[in-house]
């Protein structure tokens, strides 16, 4: 009971809030109507202010932030690697040709080209990171500064003491505590290799270190002065922590967990005590997240090699040249230097490249020729293609990675290389924090140098291997290439601007096509144009607002204006559709208010659902999608506000023009007419008189066809009806006029005896077709076009009402004004007290002549009351009497349409008035149909006869229906048109068919099934008539019929959407409501759903990272060439091991601890949770033989993978070389052997920089492998998952991390399905809750949810069938599909639930009639504006177009076809 009451109260609250919101919109519409210009100016001013945010626009260039998952390890791993390992910046130069590049002539030119890379000069004005307003370097913590100075001093002491000779290091014996003391063996070697990261010779390194130390001394002294008391105060508190930290390595795993918990509690306690004692938080130098970090924890740490310094500690100001180029003695701060000075100082590759043996460590073909090892004029001869060493320079080479499409032959132990079509050169640059901006500037110059280098003249006469013209192409790829191309696609280039303009032009034409009609003053071209501008202004306002807040632009945001404009125009169609359907409301202000009340709620719901969908996407773990969703949601919101202010104001302006029967071009027309066509006052006066006498001579064509009725009583009742009532009454009226709307036209009656009618029937017992009274016969008898006859009637005393738009008074005797009317009533009192009624149809095709088509109706009997006669001939003395008398002569529209046809009194006939009109051949397209009221059927008076008015067009249309009237009478009988077994064929004689009341009463039971069972249109007159005669006949009063025809049935010409609605009503709705149509729809969508399910089985996920760049990008050309010529040397994958104690300890030195962003939509169980486990990567005993065996097995397993070509693992090389010496599992012996191998072995020397030792333990190491070049996102995305699984050694709690630049895409590929499904689920549930607040009934929400599910299923399946892979772009479109599908679906379901139909079929017809127009137009308009994206040069925009096209197609087809059929079968009836 409580739940029931709660639900009831909730429904009441919902209804009250909706009513309140609707009333608020109603009042707001009137407020805007009174001051539209004010709203236009205010909205434009606000939009202009928000657009100023574009001044603060920034582009996000960090590719890791753009494409990585926020809470997975790709971004974190990259940060960790950069903090503890030095990585080179590699520049790749690939030369491809269809000629042999190893010919001496070509090789010499290529050698000059390579030497040119060393001669590139870069001036310091190219350093963008050191501009005047550039940011200062991040400030280090006090402990980090102290540790950095200590490590520098220790390195200098080792240099002075002679411990370091060259670059070979050695381990001394381990001490008693198990800690190794690093020393040097003093081996003679000319290797000048430097410490990794600096890559300078020892003297340069020492100089740089001294400079860095001197620069930091002043800052350190200041910090010491300010914080000396703080550090002293915390020394005692940190002593216990120091002891605990030193003992962590010896604890067991369970003890470590307890110790960590206790440590965290102590840290919290110490922090509180510290803050209470100090009371000055701003003076705290220690990291707030680690208040117990102390220098004593780090001062005794010893690294191997001695010169190793964690990169995270090197934070020297890189804008000071003495920190970068110490050998140049330049004491210049680039932030303060002038541009002229910057341009005078240059540097070359020699200053920023990684060096080996004193030279830049190139990987190049020309290393083979150094120091006379070979000659260009002779073929290349090597003993190993995988690994070759120049015996004179000791520089290693991998010919399979240098020469592409290599052709060689084996001669003994030598390989003779004869030809190659591609040459790869790799230039390594320094990648430390200090050198990064200078390397970036050089890479920019290098890219320009390589891309525009040309050697076509050298190879013109060379023989090709493909019989095509010879060519030679230069490709380049650097670390900055990714950021540059991401930045380029983030900006709107000229092609995108052109596509946007074309898209706007297309949607502009489509909007005008749907909103401009033949009657210009009813057209709404201004609203169509301003609707497009509303979307564009919404984009400017929404994006500017986010730029104000500091949100950076991302590549997908480039499609936002296309999307927002397309969606914004949808609201225009909904509003104008509602406005056009309220044509019965004559008060423009009221019409605007009712329009806003009906439509604004719908567009509010659709806009809200779209915004919710994008906001939910904004919490996805992908930053680029998050930013894109924010931009779209913000733009849609401001676009919605612009519709309710800017667009509504222009609609009010055009509504006022429509009332004056003017349009936006009227002012211009009058201006030109006043200049070139000045008329005299006399002409104006004559024109005025002509307007009075000529009965509307200057009216437009639409006005000529309106029905002229002097009826105003109860018009407010028709103006206050809702759109749903209008459409319901329209279909009822259609049903009463043409109940089945078939092709036959027949009226028959039965006599008392069948024998008297035998001549009128055929042998089958059906009426003889030759005796059928067709509509053509009626017109031949009734239509008269003789103007002279009409004039004669006027001379004999007849009167007529003349129309005048400006005055309300009698003119020329008996002429009276008729508003909005071009059909005049001519009455004459003739003989036998009969009243002749005529209808004049003014056909004004010329200005000086008008024609009247008059139809003389049947003579109607009436009482000889003088008061009745005075109604026509004489105007009463008072207005009230005139009004009352006029009401008695209301014109009935629904009377019989046959002339001279009567029903004989004794015939057993049941006549439904709707069937009579239907059988007469009358169609709803006729404009003017009038007749008089029937008298009381209980009397024997003659029934009213039919008066009909036709114009030439109607006559032509009617001929088509008459031709189809020859349908078999048997079919007509099945259609309930034959009411009896006997027939009396009605001939063309002027007989009266009389129907006695007795027979009507006797046959009342049989009559009920033929009468209209609807009472929506019943009035007092009809109710009295029905109640008095057992409700056998259902009629409207003459007044109601006239008003109904005027206000409901006949849409005015030029009404927006009129012809489209007529097509829907006359063709589409009958097809969809038929059994055949429903069967076709069910079969078609069953096939579509089955294909979608099959398509889901073909799903592929992922996107190649080069596809994220434009089609014309040099990155894509480089990648294509690399895949072609070097298939076995694809991505260079790095695998890292980090000791968790080491990582956590040194990360505590950072003043601001980095916290990875997270999203609850995704959790990587294989990475984050495992790496956070307290057991992982702690206290690993590398001397354990079992662990060593697992490492070897891991290496073999990885090497056997299909995507791996070669593995370079220094650890396994060491284990295989010294396997017999490592069986004792002695730590001291293990590290001693390891040191000797790194020092003495040539292979070990190559891997020396891959290992980091701290205090006698291996705390970090890495290895590399190449994987195959595969242009398949599904295959390439598997490597990351496989690598993580293979490098996981569970038995020893070892988990390594695999990394490559493409991993930011690959890990996204692995998680995209999970994220998409979660995102879709949350979006659907949230939107359904919002929709349920608006839509009536729980059952309707279930149907909406089902349709959304089917739409998404079809989109997902057909994406796979079309070859579109699942990636972050297609994911956001799938989420967007929920918004689109809920828009279109909710429009139909809401119209269905609010419709007043008696059956599901009727409700379906009414809902389609009302809303299929806005649904179809909104989808097509959106598609037109995005269609131009197909021609974009960026893959993600093409994917956006393809996916969104599927979304729009299935959303429209399901909403306009499957959903109506489903509702007609299972929809909520109440």
Swiss-Prot record:
Extracellular side: 57-493, 550-554, 620-622, 1099-1300, 1362-1367, 1432-1434
Keywords assigned by UniProt, alphabetized: Cell membrane, Glycoprotein, Lipid transport, Membrane, Transmembrane, Transmembrane helix, Transport
Phenotypic effect of disruption: Repeated attempts to generate a knockout failed. Conditional knockdown results in decreased parasite fitness during asexual stages. Increased sensitivity to saponin, a cholesterol-binding compound capable of penetrating membranes. Impaired digestive vacuole morphology.
One of the Pfam families matching this protein, by short name: Patched
Compartment(s) where it occurs, according to its Swiss-Prot or TrEMBL record: Cell membrane
Annotated membrane topology: Multi-pass membrane protein
Ranges per topology, Cytoplasmic: 1-3, 35, 515-524, 583-587, 660-663, 674-1057, 1074, 1335-1337, 1395-1399, 1467-1470
Catalysed transformations (reactions): cholesterol(in) = cholesterol(out)
Effect of residue 1436 to I: Increases resistance to MMV009108, MMV028038 and MMV019662
Transmembrane segments annotated in the record for this chain: 36-56, 494-514, 525-549, 555-582, 588-619, 623-659, 1075-1098, 1301-1334, 1338-1361, 1368-1394, 1400-1431, 1435-1466
Gene Ontology CC terms: membrane
Boundaries of every SSD domain copy: 494-653
Annotated glycosylation sites: 78, 165, 294, 361, 1218
InterPro entries in the cross-refs: Patched_domain-protein (IPR051697), PTHD_SSD (IPR003392), SSD (IPR000731)
Keyword Cytoplasm recorded: no
pH-related activity note: Optimum pH is 7.0. Inactive at pH 7.4 and 8.0.
Intramembrane runs of residues: 4-34, 664-673, 1058-1073
Family matches, as PANTHER family: PATCHED-RELATED (PTHR10796), PATCHED-RELATED, ISOFORM A (PTHR10796:SF92)
Family: Belongs to the patched family.
Misc: Mutations in the protein confer resistance to three diverse compounds: MMV009108, MMV028038 and MMV019662.
Function field: Facilitates cholesterol efflux from membranes in a pH-dependent manner. Required for maintaining normal parasite plasma membrane lipid composition. Required for the proper functioning of digestive vacuole. Required for the viability of blood-stage parasites.
Record's protein name: Niemann-Pick type C1-related protein
């Amino acid at each position: 009971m409580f739940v029931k009451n709660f639900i009831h109260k909730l429904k009441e609250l919902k209804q009250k809030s909706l009513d309140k919101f609707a009333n608020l919109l109603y009042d707001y519409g009137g407020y805007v109507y009174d001051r539209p210009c004010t709203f236009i100016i205010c909205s434009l001013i606000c939009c202009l202010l928000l657009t100023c945010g574009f001044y603060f626009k920034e582009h996000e260039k960090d590719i890791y932030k753009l494409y990585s998952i926020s809470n997975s390890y790709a971004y974190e791993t990259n940060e960790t690697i950069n903090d503890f390992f030095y990585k080179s910046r590699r520049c790749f130069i690939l030369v491809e040709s269809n000629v042999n590049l190893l010919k001496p002539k070509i090789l010499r030119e290529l050698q000059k080209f390579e030497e040119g890379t060393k001669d590139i000069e870069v001036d310091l004005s190219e350093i963008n990171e050191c501009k005047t307003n550039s940011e200062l370097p991040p400030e280090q913590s006090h402990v980090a500064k102290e540790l950095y100075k200590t490590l520098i001093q220790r390195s200098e002491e080792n240099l002075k003491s002679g411990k370091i000779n060259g670059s070979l290091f050695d381990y001394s014996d381990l001490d008693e505590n198990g800690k190794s003391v690093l020393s040097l063996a003093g081996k003679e070697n000319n290797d000048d290799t430097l410490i990794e990261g600096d890559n300078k010779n020892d003297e340069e390194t020492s100089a740089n270190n001294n400079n860095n130390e001197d620069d930091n001394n002043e800052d350190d002294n200041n910090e010491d002065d300010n914080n000396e008391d703080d550090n002293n105060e915390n020394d005692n508190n940190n002593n216990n922590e120091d002891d605990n930290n030193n003992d962590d390595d010896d604890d067991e795993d369970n003890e470590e967990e307890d110790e960590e918990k206790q440590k965290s509690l102590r840290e919290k306690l110490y922090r509180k005590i510290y803050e209470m004692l100090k009371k000055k938080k701003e003076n705290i130098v220690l990291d707030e997240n680690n208040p117990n970090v102390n220098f004593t924890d780090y001062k005794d740490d010893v690294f191997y090699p001695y010169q190793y310094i964690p990169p995270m500690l090197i934070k020297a100001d890189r804008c000071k040249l003495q920190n970068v180029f110490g050998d140049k003695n330049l004491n210049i701060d680039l932030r303060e230097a002038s541009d002229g000075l910057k341009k005078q100082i240059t540097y070359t590759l020699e200053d920023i490249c990684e060096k080996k043996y004193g030279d830049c460590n190139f990987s190049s073909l020309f290393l083979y020729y150094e120091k006379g090892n070979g000659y260009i004029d002779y073929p290349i001869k090597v003993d190993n293609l995988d690994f070759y060493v120049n015996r004179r320079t000791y520089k290693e080479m991998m010919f399979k990675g240098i020469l592409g499409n290599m052709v060689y032959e084996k001669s003994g132990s030598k390989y003779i290389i004869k030809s190659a079509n591609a040459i790869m050169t790799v230039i390594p640059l320094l990648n430390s924090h200090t050198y990064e901006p200078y390397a970036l500037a050089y890479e920019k110059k290098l890219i320009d140098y390589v891309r525009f280098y040309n050697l076509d003249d050298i190879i013109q006469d060379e023989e090709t291997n493909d019989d095509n013209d010879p060519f030679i192409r230069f490709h380049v790829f650097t670390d900055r290439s990714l950021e540059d191309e991401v930045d380029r696609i983030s900006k709107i280039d000229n092609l995108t601007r052109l596509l946007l303009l074309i898209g706007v032009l297309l949607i502009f034409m489509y909007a005008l096509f749907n909103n401009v009609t033949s009657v210009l003053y009813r057209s709404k071209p201004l609203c169509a144009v301003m609707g497009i501008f509303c979307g564009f202004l919404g984009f400017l306002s929404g994006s500017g607002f986010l730029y104000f807040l500091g949100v950076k632009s991302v590549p997908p945001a480039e499609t936002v204006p296309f999307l927002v404009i397309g969606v914004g125009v949808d609201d225009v169609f909904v509003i104008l559709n509602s406005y056009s359907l309220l044509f019965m409301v004559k008060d423009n202000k009221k019409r605007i208010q009712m329009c806003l009340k009906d439509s604004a709620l719908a567009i509010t719901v659709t806009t809200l659902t779209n915004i919710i969908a994008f906001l939910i996407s904004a919490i996805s773990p992908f930053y680029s999608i998050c930013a894109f969703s924010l931009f779209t949601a913000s733009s849609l919101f401001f676009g919605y506000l612009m519709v309710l202010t800017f667009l509504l104001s222009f609609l009010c302006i055009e509504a006022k023009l429509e009332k004056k029967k003017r349009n936006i071009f009227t002012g211009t027309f009058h201006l030109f007419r006043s200049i070139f066509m000045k008329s005299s006052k006399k002409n104006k006066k004559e024109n005025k008189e002509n307007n009075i006498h000529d009965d509307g001579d200057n009216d437009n064509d639409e006005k000529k066809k309106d029905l002229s009725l002097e009826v105003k009583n109860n018009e407010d009742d028709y103006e206050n009806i809702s759109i749903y009532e209008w459409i319901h009454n329209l279909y009822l009226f259609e049903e009463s006029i043409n109940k089945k709307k078939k092709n036959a036209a027949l009226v028959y009656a039965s006599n008392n005896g069948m024998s008297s009618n035998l001549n009128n029937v055929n042998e089958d017992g059906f009426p003889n077709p030759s005796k059928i009274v067709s509509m053509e016969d009626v017109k031949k008898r009734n239509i008269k076009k003789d103007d002279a006859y009409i004039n004669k009637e006027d001379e004999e005393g007849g009167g007529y009402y003349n129309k005048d738009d400006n005055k309300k008074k009698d003119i020329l005797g008996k002429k009276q004004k008729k508003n909005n009317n071009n059909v005049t009533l001519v009455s004459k009192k003739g003989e036998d007290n009969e009243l002749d009624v005529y209808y004049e149809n003014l056909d004004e095709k010329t200005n000086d002549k008008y024609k009247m088509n008059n139809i003389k109706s049947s003579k109607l009997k009436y009482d000889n009351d003088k008061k009745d006669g005075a109604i026509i001939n004489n105007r009463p003395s008072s207005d009230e009497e005139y009004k009352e008398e006029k009401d008695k002569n209301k014109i009935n529209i629904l009377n019989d349409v046959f002339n001279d046809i009567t029903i004989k009194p004794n015939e057993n006939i049941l006549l439904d008035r709707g069937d009579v009109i239907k059988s007469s051949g009358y169609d709803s397209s006729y404009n003017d149909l009038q007749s008089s009221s029937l008298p009381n059927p209980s009397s024997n008076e003659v029934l009213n006869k039919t008066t009909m008015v036709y114009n030439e067009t109607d006559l032509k249309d009617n001929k088509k229906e008459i031709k189809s009237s020859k349908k078999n009478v048997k079919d007509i009988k099945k259609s309930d048109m034959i009411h009896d077994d006997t027939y009396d064929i009605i001939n063309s004689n002027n007989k009266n068919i009389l129907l006695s009341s007795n027979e009507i009463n006797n046959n009342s039971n049989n009559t009920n099934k033929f009468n209209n069972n609807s009472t929506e249109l019943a009035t007092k007159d009809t109710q009295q008539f029905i109640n008095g005669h057992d409700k056998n006949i259902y009629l409207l009063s003459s007044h109601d019929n006239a008003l109904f025809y005027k206000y409901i049935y006949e849409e005015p010409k030029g009404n927006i959407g009129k012809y489209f609605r007529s097509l829907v009503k006359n063709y589409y709705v009958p097809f969809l409501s038929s059994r055949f149509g429903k069967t076709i729809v069910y079969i078609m969508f069953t096939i579509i759903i089955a294909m979608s399910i099959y398509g889901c089985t073909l799903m592929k996920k992922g996107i190649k990272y080069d596809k994220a760049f434009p089609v014309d990008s040099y990155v894509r050309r480089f990648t294509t060439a690399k895949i072609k010529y070097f298939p076995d040397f694809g991505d260079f994958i790095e695998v890292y091991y980090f000791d968790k104690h080491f990582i956590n300890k040194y990360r505590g030195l950072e003043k601001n601890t980095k916290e990875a962003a997270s999203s609850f939509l995704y959790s990587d169980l294989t990475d984050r949770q495992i790496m956070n486990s307290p057991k992982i990567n702690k206290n690993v005993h590398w001397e354990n033989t079992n662990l060593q065996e697992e490492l070897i097995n891991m290496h073999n397993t990885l090497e056997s993978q299909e995507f791996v070509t070669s593995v370079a693992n220094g650890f396994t090389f060491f284990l295989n070389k010294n396997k017999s010496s490592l069986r004792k599992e002695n730590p001291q012996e293990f590290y001693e052997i390891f040191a000797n191998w790194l020092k003495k072995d040539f292979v070990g020397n190559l891997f020396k920089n891959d290992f980091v030792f701290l205090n006698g333990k291996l705390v970090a190491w890495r290895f590399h492998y190449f994987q195959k070049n595969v242009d398949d996102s599904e295959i390439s995305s598997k490597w990351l998952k496989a690598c993580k699984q293979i490098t996981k050694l569970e038995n020893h709690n070892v988990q390594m991390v695999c990394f490559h630049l493409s991993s930011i895409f690959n890990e996204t590929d692995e998680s995209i399905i999970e994220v998409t499904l979660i995102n879709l689920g949350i979006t659907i549930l949230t939107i359904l809750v919002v929709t349920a607040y608006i839509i009536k009934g729980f059952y309707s929400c279930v149907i909406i949810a089902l349709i959304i599910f089917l739409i998404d299923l079809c989109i997902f399946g057909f994406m796979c069938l079309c070859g579109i892979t699942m990636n972050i772009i297609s994911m956001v479109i799938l989420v967007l599909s929920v918004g689109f599908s809920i828009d279109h679906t909710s429009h139909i379901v809401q119209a269905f639930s609010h419709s007043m139909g008696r059956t599901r079929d009727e409700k379906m017809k009414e809902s389609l009639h009302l809303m299929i127009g806005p649904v179809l137009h909104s989808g097509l308009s959106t598609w037109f504006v995005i269609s131009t994206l197909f021609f974009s040069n960026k893959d993600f925009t093409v994917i956006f177009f393809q996916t969104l096209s599927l979304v729009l197609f299935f959303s429209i087809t399901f909403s306009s076809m499957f959903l109506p059929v489903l509702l007609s079968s299972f929809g909520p009836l109440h």
